[in-house]
Amino acid sequence: MSSKHWDYKKDLVLSHLAGLCQSNPHVRLIESERVVISAENQEDKITLISGGGSGHEPLHAGFVTKDGLLDAAVAGFIFASPSTKQIFSAIKAKPSKKGTLIIVKNYTGDILHFGLAAEKAKAEGLNAELLIVQDDVSVGKAKNGLVGRRGLAGTSLVHKILGAKAYLQKDNLELHQLVTFGEKVVANLVTIGASLDHVTIPARANKQEEDDSDDEHGYEVLKHDEFEIGMGIHNEPGIKKSSPIPTVDELVAELLEYLLSTTDKDRNYVQFDKNDEVVLLINNLGGTSVLELYAIQNIVVDQLASKYSIKPVRIFTGTFTTSLDGPGFSITLLNATKTGDKDILKFLDHKTSAPGWNSNISDWSGRVDNFIVAAPEIDEGDSSSKVSVDAKLYADLLESGVKKVISKEPKITLYDTVAGDGDCGETLANGSNAILKALAEGKLDLKDGVKSLVQITDIVETAMGGTSGGLYSIFISALAKSLKEKELSEGAYTLTLETISGSLQAALQSLFKYTRARTGDRTLIDALEPFVKEFAKSKDLKLANKAAHDGAEATRKLEAKFGRASYVAEEEFKQFESEGGLPDPGAIGLAALISGITDAYFKSETKL
């Protein structure tokens, strides 16, 4: 994993807070104390204040709002607890006649500093109480002793639930009642995470020796094939390092065992009974893609149902409590039933403008367990034709062509890793393998020149995707259309090189309606256009094959004008100077297909 971060002239934490307030009209910044507060004073409700070391964004400042979450958040330096002075400033900035609830994660520095601020507030006659969030299950009861569990992503749920309760029930809610309820919420939370590496900390002008972590030891960077379970959000070591990296399905199964096992008495912090309502939170630790995050959620939900008979009544997936750029995720479960408050789901569903609570769903009434629906039926009509072709020759040409493409996949992938996004070889191989499969299963009507091309279009469109898939699909579909039009105007006929050459020209013109790329633009057109033009002129497949090959090779000297290759720096191309330059991967792939078809044609005794 890269250890690089951008460099900042100004204080990173303060710049972050300023940026947050610039983009959110509902909050203000006490710059000298690094405190973000709600722009509205609501002294008729219990105020909620939280905070801690920076690096866990959007927690905590991203949860400050006017409508039912935090009223203030205090930011320390990265992974370092804020000072008591800062915290006390937040308390004074958001006074309340009904009192202030201070929520902290269970780390020694936070408890000491926030606790002292609470005591100072009480000494001045203010009503203030401290609630400590602890939801980690990775460290068992025997080891954590008097320290308790670490505070992790469950803190986000605590903020949301208690913030909404204080807002919605402000007229009838007392501080001691909110504290008692908060303790029940915390007692019914469990969280565990997994990561591919420890996080990297940006350089900063204001370094501090202490941090929020209670870990007295350093950490070792994980090896490239290693992962870790139970890693803390301040780089604290977890409970297990292992190699090789498992599938997410296997990893999720292990993580859920830590959360839900009834036989592991050391970690059985929360009991989940059959009819309990359970809330699930999938949290991005900072470096996990959104694509992966929802896939992880899907796997978690499936395993909760199949192995534990748990169907979460609410699912929240996103970036809530991070560890800078941590390449991992955490799973949090809340037993909503055992908190004893029938309105707890209403608190979770309450709409908020806080940017840190990144779930905009407040109405769950339309939720269904089976969310899969059938695709609409599309009547594509009968593509059958009276355009005949020798089925054996056709099969041989297809098989030889796609096998040649598959053999070139590693080289095409290498080229595209530099010139594009690295998927060209795999995309072409996917389409080729799908055609081989269709041939093996007899799914192509190879006696019908038009119907078979329509079938191949469907296969290519489904298997390939991307730009290549689109170009191939349009061209093959247009080729089928041209062959069909000839039948409609002239009647039944058998494919010959001459009829094919005319339809290839028509197909190329159709393709040109959808792409501005032409020969010389360093795309697959550099192989396709010369092939079609030479074939139309000479009706000689060998000459046309050579034209395609020469066109593809010529791209080694061309400047890219289309696609991702057009953005690549010139120095990236230098590693291929020994072979004449870096060619366009798509052109090389198409030339391989044409070459394979040509080889098979001249080996066959049957000719068109």
Swiss-Prot record:
It is an enzyme of class 2 (transferase). This is Dihydroxyacetone kinase. Keywords: ATP-binding, Cytoplasm, Glycerol metabolism, Kinase, Nucleotide-binding, Transferase. It is found in: Cytoplasm. The lineage of its organism: Eukaryota, Fungi, Dikarya, Ascomycota, Saccharomycotina. Gene3D superfamilies: 1.25.40.340, Dihydroxyacetone kinase, domain 1 (3.40.50.10440), Dihydroxyacetone kinase, domain 2 (3.30.1180.20). NCBIfam families: dak_ATP. Catalyzes both the phosphorylation of dihydroxyacetone and of glyceraldehyde. PROSITE patterns: DHAK, DHAL. It comes from the Eukaryota. Substrate binds at residues 53-56, 105, 110. Pathway: Polyol metabolism; glycerol fermentation; glycerone phosphate from glycerol (oxidative route): step 2/2. The gene is DAK. The active site is at 234 (tele-hemiaminal-histidine intermediate). It catalyses: dihydroxyacetone + ATP = dihydroxyacetone phosphate + ADP + H(+); D-glyceraldehyde + ATP = D-glyceraldehyde 3-phosphate + ADP + H(+). One of its GO terms (molecular function) is glycerone kinase activity. GO terms for cellular component: cytosol. Residues 8-357 form the DhaK domain. Its EC number is 2.7.1.28, 2.7.1.29. SUPFAM superfamilies: DAK1/DegV-like, DhaL-like. Belongs to the dihydroxyacetone kinase (DAK) family. SMART domains: Dak2 (SM01120). Its main location: cytoplasm.
